[in-house]
Every structure is written in C-alpha cells, then in structure tokens.
Design a protein with these regions (language model features):
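Short hydrophobic alpha-helical segments of the AMP-binding
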Residues: 41, 191, 334
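Catalytic subdomain that performs nucleotidyl-dependent activation
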Residues: 133, 138-142, 147-237, 241, ...
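ATP-dependent adenylation/nucleotidyltransferase module used to activate substrates
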Residues: 2-155, 185, 275
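Non-catalytic, surface-exposed connector residues within folded enzymatic/regulatory domains
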Residues: 67, 208, 228-231, 300-304
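A structural signal for well-ordered alpha-helical scaffolds and beta->alpha junctions
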Residues: 1, 5, 70, 180, ...
C-alpha cells in the first residue's frame, strides 16, 4: 500500500514531526495500529536515515493475553533487527534486551485520578526515561484518524476546553503521531496487503467502555445519518483548534502573572480575583486549566462546567467565603484571594 506510506510522508512534510537522522522509539502494543506504525517506520528508515528502537509495556491487566502480547512484540522487534525495552508493571521490572532492572514501587495511586489516566502517565514516563537513557530524539505512538475522532467526541461530551480538544497533535514535544491522518480502515488494508500479523484486544469490543461505545455506536450512527466523512471532518477540525490553542498558549505565562497567581504544587494555587477578572474570558479559562495542570496530573475529567464554576467564584461580588469541590479539587475564595488545591 504505497498510498498509505505516501500519505504519511505528505503529512510529515506538512507538520514536520521528524527530520533526517532522527533516533525514534516506536511504542508498540502489538495491535494493528502499532504494527503498521513500526513497519512504515522501518520502510522509511533508509530514506530518512532513522535509527529505530521498540518500546512495549506489559500492564498485566489481561493475564496470559498480556504476556502473549509481550512475546509477540519481542519477536516482532527481533525480526526487524531492532533493540527493545519492555516495562513489566506486574513484575515491576524494566527489560533492556537481555538485561533486567528492578524498579522502585510505582507511586501510590493519586487522589482525583482514574486508572486509565494513571496508566497513561506511567506509559509516557517510561517512554521518556528510555528516550533520555538511550539518547533518542522522538517517541512515535500509533494514534490514527479514528482515534482522533473518537477522542474529540469523548471530550466534547465531557465538556472539554480548547486544550482537551487539541491535545492529540502530529507532534507534542518529543511525541510524534505519524498515523494521525490515516484511518483505521486504511491501516487494516495495509496489514492485509503486506501479510502482517497483529494482536487483538478483545476489550476493544466492550461497549461498557465509553470510547468503545462511541466507536461502535455513535460514530457509525453519525456516519449513516449525518456525515459519511465524520471521522476526517473531526480530525481536520482538531488541527485547526490546535492552532488557535497554540496562540493562547503563547501568552498564558504572562496572563498567569497578570492574575497574580502564586503556584505551589503542595499547597495549591492562590490568585487575585480582582486581577483575574481583568483578563479576557478565553484567557481566564486557559489560565485556570494551566494552573490546575500544575497541581493535578491529568485534566481529562475536568469539564468546561468546572472551569466556569471557578470563573463565577472569582467574579462574585459576595463578601462571604465561597467554596466549591469537584474531581479531587477544592476551591475557596476569601476576600480577593482564591485558593485552588488538591483535596
């Protein structure tokens, strides 16, 4: 499927996620998307002079299936002649090819978090540790156009702001997403044409899981009744939103200072209600999300309504003490001072 590889090259040319000679870690779960990603990177390596390495995480959440995934990815790396790093969360160990390193116990499960968010943090922390240790430039993950559409719908339904709607970019710091403009159907066709095997996670069919319900119920309904190209439409929209968000982001540090914010990760954040109210409403919301991100690991469960509740507290003319509490956060206003901290 030359068209898929050409599409990825064109996408990379537009958004510049990599440059010639880059050393790239490919995050491979063993599923169809990551197997496709690895094969494409291997085929592009001679042209771009890439040096590649595989990283895999065995969460141990699916018992023998998790171990079979790990075995499959190890064999895949061997066939491509690539080195591999494996994090086994169940055994609390990192495997660097033949070497084994005992890890300290994982940090305690933080308040206000859920399992999915915490595992995501462990995953990206591991990739970054390997990147720094092995002196690599980038980490390639296999998010595709379907993932982008599913994610934006999830976040719209949860009331996300610009940050939540624009977080999956072609490149976020050291994270690149070469497949972000490629649909799942194209990926499966590529795997079939190239006779590439992959692992299947049966939990992806469980519609009790929010993302799966959107994937198997909502998106097909929207495609049939409203827009047959809804996935591409949503994915393209996110790229536009990302540009708008980047503009706000460029000015957020200055805005936080103008709000008189004093950030202390342990004690939380204190800001001036009067100074905060002088900011443009769009900047206010962005400031609050940035401030909260300094004291809370993940903002996935922070909805637009939560942000608006804090804005209302800062704008209130009431003289009595005002309080709010949600998603592990506490907010308290006394006079001009508004304090935000982890419950």
């Amino acid at each position: 499927m030359k068209n898929l590889i050409k599409n990825i090259q064109n996408f990379a040319g537009r958004y510049g996620p990599w440059k010639k000679g880059d050393k790239i870690i490919a995050a491979v779960s063993g599923g169809p998307d990551s197997v496709c990603l690895l094969d494409v990177l291997v085929k592009l390596a001679p042209k771009y002079n890439f040096k590649l390495r595989v990283a895999h995480i065995n969460y141990g959440l699916r018992g023998k299936d998790s171990n079979r995934d790990e075995k499959f990815v190890r064999e895949l790396a061997r066939r491509y002649g690539l080195e591999i790093s494996v994090l086994s969360i169940a055994k609390n160990k990192i495997y660097e090819n033949a070497k084994v390193f005992q890890l300290p116990p994982n940090p305690p499960f933080p308040k206000g978090e859920n399992l999915e968010n915490w595992l995501r943090k462990i995953r990206y922390d591991f990739f970054e540790k390997i990147r720094k240790k092995e002196k690599y430039d980038l980490i390639a993950v296999a998010h595709n156009q379907d993932d982008q559409a599913e994610t934006v719908l999830m976040r719209i339904l949860r009331g996300a702001g610009l940050q939540g709607l624009s977080s999956m970019k072609p490149k976020n710091n050291k994270i690149i997403r070469p497949l972000l403009n490629t649909g799942r159907k194209e990926i499966l066709e590529y795997l079939k044409a190239n006779k590439l095997k992959y692992r299947t996670d049966i939990t992806n069919k469980d519609i009790k899981i929010f993302r799966n319900k959107i994937r198997h119920r909502l998106i097909p309904y929207l495609e049939k009744n409203y827009n047959p190209n809804i996935k591409k439409t949503l994915a393209d929209m996110v790229l536009v939103i990302a540009d708008d968000y980047d503009y706000l982001l460029a000015n957020e540090e200055r805005a936080i200072k103008r709000a008189g914010a004093d950030i202390n990760k342990k004690g939380g954040v204190i800001l001036s209600a009067k100074k905060f109210q002088k900011l443009h409403p769009a900047v206010q919301r962005q400031c609050l999300r940035k401030i909260i991100s300094q004291i809370k690991t993940d903002l996935t469960d922070i909805e637009a309504g939560h942000i608006e509740e804090i804005v209302k507290i800062t704008a209130s003319a009431k003289s009595k003490i005002q309080k709010a509490e949600f998603k592990g956060l506490k907010i308290k206003r006394k006079g001009d001072k508004v304090r935000i901290w982890i419950n």
